[in-house]
Amino acid sequence: SSILASLRAMSHDHSHEHVDPAGLVHEVATRLAAVGQRLTQTRRSIVEALAGADRPLSIPEILTGGAGLAQSSVYRNLSVLERAGVVSRVVTTDEWARFELSEVLTGHHHHLVCSKCGAVDDVRVPDDVEADLDRALAVLAERAGFALQHHRLDLVGVCGACR
């Protein structure tokens, strides 16, 4: 089918490469202020680590990338950043949650999640396929009496490294 062809043709998306650093800092500071918080150096370091990654990161990966960050501080600050809508948690199949900048900052995308190693890759669906998916999900939601606001799609399988 044409949808399968489009999906096969899609490439892994380095969705954060187009984020403007100055605009990002301003948007993050604004979102934090809206929930009564400030953009501290620790929060800035976490946001910079996530913005510089081409996929969602685990806390150990954030700690590796952020000079001098304490694990307890990263946990606390990720929670604040989540509440402010700056960071989203990606549930995976291993023991580590992964974190990424929220879609309001990076744009809508989906995830490929490896059921063996827990790796997560960002992937963007072509606009025409995304529109078809939106319509199909809206119909399913309506039939269930559910008011759909948005969707998140994680495709679970086995990555190339584990195959």
Where are the regions that the model predicts?
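Basic amphipathic alpha-helical segments that dock to polyanions
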Residues: 74-85
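Non-DNA-binding regulatory cores of transcription-related proteins
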Residues: 84-163
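N-terminal leader segment of winged-helix/HTH proteins
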Residues: 2-38
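Pre-recognition alpha-helix immediately N-terminal to the DNA-recognition helix
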Residues: 44-49
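A short acidic, leucine-rich amphipathic alpha-helix
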Residues: 61-65
